[in-house]
């Protein structure tokens, strides 16, 4: 980042993604979390942070401030965008990590309260300025963007896979199933919700679910628009996800090793974002990986003449790392604008 001053980030939501963002920022040299909006009690928020990270002694609670060796963050008992006075804290950007406020009007509320720019941790509900997936469409970012989504962990993994393979081979169509750890909006016991299947216990069931990634491909990866279907199976594990993708190639000559070689090369082209493994790993082996996509070469098989099935791994902290990459991307654009 060209700017010598740390990027001042405001954070709404201190759930799993919020805590991962905070921990990653505390180990960076260019980002500071200056304010955190969450209705949790400060002692409990600090307790949850320390319970799931290494070197928890780095983080202390001093009154209403979370403190680490790099910066201190004010904890504010607020949970709605329209109630949070971001202007008081002089933030450069706000990350909404709640997963709840995905409409443009919610993002506008952040802007109205002093956030120069707001980035969603999830896909939006309606039209916003930009969806940016690092490694896929970084070049689409514009300094005028104010309401931005960084996609989701699943959409990032899928778009990276499709971009890499479609740059090497002609793809007819594809279908993706994410075998996904349960999420915080699922109930541990059967509980009447808005969706029949998601009303069943997350701890006891494999739960089929829809996924919206394919609906946004026209913005993120236009060449794959209308060629992909996406689906999710939520399973009873805490962390670690598997992307099971079936790709129909136009050229029947494309084989298993062609695909594996393409992904091995991509690991060099996308350092820190894409990797590969030749080991027979399972979901717990990917926990803690900050990659957006870890390609499993042992999972590549061919069915018939044109269908290639691939397996790729990812976990939520990889998406948290990409959120901070999007923060850096826009900070760099701002700095270039100032120089110009």
Predicted regions: what is each one?
Residues 156-175, 212-229, 326:
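Oxidoreductase and adenylate-handling cofactor-binding alpha/beta cores
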Residues 194-205, 237-248:
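Glycine-rich phosphate/diphosphate-binding loops and the adjacent beta-loop-alpha structural elements
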Residues 140-142, 198, 236-241, 302-305:
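Short, flexible turn/loop "capping" segments at secondary-structure junctions
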Residues 39-42, 124-125, 152-154, 178-185, ...:
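Glycine-rich beta-alpha junction loops
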Residues 148-149, 201-207, 229-235:
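A short glycine-threonine-serine/GTX helix/turn-capping micro-motif
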Residues 230, 242, 246-340:
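C-terminal active-site/capping subdomain that shapes the small-molecule cofactor and substrate pocket
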Residues 205-210, 281:
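Active-site pocket-shaping loop/turn-to-helix segments
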Residues 2-188, 192-199, 333-337:
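N-terminal Rossmann-like NAD(P) cofactor-binding subdomain of oxidoreductases
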């Amino acid at each position: 980042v060209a700017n010598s001053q740390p990027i001042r980030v405001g954070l709404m939501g201190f759930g799993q993604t919020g805590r991962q963002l905070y921990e990653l920022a505390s180990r960076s040299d260019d980002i500071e979390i200056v304010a955190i909006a969450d209705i949790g009690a400060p002692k409990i928020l600090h307790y949850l942070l320390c319970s799931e990270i290494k070197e928890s002694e780095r983080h202390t609670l001093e009154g209403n401030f979370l403190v680490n060796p790099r910066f201190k963050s004010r904890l504010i008992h607020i949970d709605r965008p329209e109630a949070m006075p971001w202007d008081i804290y002089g933030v450069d950007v706000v990350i909404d990590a709640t997963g709840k406020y995905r409409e443009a009007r919610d993002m506008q509320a952040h802007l109205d309260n002093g956030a120069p720019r707001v980035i969603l941790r999830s896909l939006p509900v309606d039209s916003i300025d930009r969806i940016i997936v690092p490694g896929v469409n970084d070049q689409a970012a514009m300094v005028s963007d104010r309401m931005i989504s960084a996609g989701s962990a699943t959409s990032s993994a899928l778009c990276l896979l499709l971009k890499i393979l479609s740059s090497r081979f002609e793809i007819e169509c594809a279908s993706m199933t994410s075998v996904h750890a349960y999420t915080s909006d699922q109930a541990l016991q059967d509980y009447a919700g808005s969706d029949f299947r998601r009303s069943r216990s997350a701890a006891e069931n494999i739960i089929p679910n829809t996924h919206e990634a394919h609906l946004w491909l026209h913005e993120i990866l236009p060449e794959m628009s209308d060629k992909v279907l996406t689906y999710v199976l939520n399973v009873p594990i805490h962390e670690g996800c598997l992307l099971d993708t079936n790709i129909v190639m136009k050229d029947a000559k494309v084989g298993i090793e062609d695909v594996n070689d393409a992904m091995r090369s991509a690991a060099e082209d996308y350092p820190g974002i894409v990797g590969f493994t030749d080991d027979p790993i399972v979901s717990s082996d990917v926990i803690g990986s900050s990659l957006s996509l870890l390609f499993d070469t042992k999972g590549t098989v061919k069915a018939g003449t044109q269908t290639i099935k691939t397996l790729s791994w990812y976990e939520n902290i990889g998406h948290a790392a990409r959120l901070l990459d999007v923060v850096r991307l826009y900070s760099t654009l701002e700095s270039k604008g100032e120089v110009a």
